[in-house]
């Protein structure tokens, strides 16, 4: 049966703390993007997925607090640009910039021939008093971004070259008390589509969130 697609929306609740430090905006941009149905098999990067990898890897390089993550307008478009607002101490600013440069180089190599314009920029916003995510909330958000599936999950066993099942984390938004992620889940097989939706639901609920 032809099942088509569905949107799975994850709501991850967050709590905040007052903090003071150097505010940085990290922007991942320059991606090819495309339609999550037509272009999902072309090995293009999704900026929201890259942002998750960036934030997780950064923890080992420089301590930081997370303020917000955002990226994408439509869940059926491969996200071309994603932004994280961070707070760190002055001594760590250079380390964040160095890490951004190294990730940009690594991703351009990883996506050679398919997404070579990936750019990672760090903008200094100066010293600010802001409400950052509680460390537990930050970890949940980063864990969600690293683990929410993206891309081709299965090729068709009967039609050569046809994508059977895929998913795209196309929208990321942060408000005062939640981070929202919206995925476009597609499959020509209804049970496979539902299983993939269930997987994202399980991830969301495990992190204390709600899924619709």
Describe each PLM feature range:
Residues 64-66, 208-212:
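Short secondary-structure junctions
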């Amino acid at each position: 049966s032809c099942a088509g697609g569905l949107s799975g929306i994850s709501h991850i609740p967050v709590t905040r703390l007052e903090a003071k430090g150097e505010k940085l905006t990290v922007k991942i941009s320059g991606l090819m993007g495309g339609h999550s149905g037509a272009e999902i098999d072309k090995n293009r990067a999704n900026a929201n997925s890259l942002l998750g990898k960036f934030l997780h890897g950064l923890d080992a390089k420089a301590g930081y607090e997370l303020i917000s993550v955002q990226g994408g307008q439509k869940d059926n478009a491969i996200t071309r640009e994603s932004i994280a607002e961070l707070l760190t101490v002055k001594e760590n600013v250079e380390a964040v910039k160095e890490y951004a440069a190294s990730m940009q180089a690594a991703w351009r190599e990883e996506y050679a021939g398919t997404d070579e314009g990936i750019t990672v920029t760090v903008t200094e916003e100066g010293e600010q008093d802001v409400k950052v995510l509680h460390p537990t909330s930050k970890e949940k958000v980063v864990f969600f971004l690293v683990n929410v599936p993206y891309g081709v999950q299965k090729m068709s066993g009967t039609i050569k070259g046809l994508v059977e099942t895929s998913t795209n984390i196309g929208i990321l938004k942060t408000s005062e008390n939640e981070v929202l992620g919206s995925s476009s889940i597609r499959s020509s097989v209804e049970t496979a589509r539902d299983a993939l939706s269930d997987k994202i639901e399980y991830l969301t609920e495990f992190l204390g969130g709600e899924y619709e």
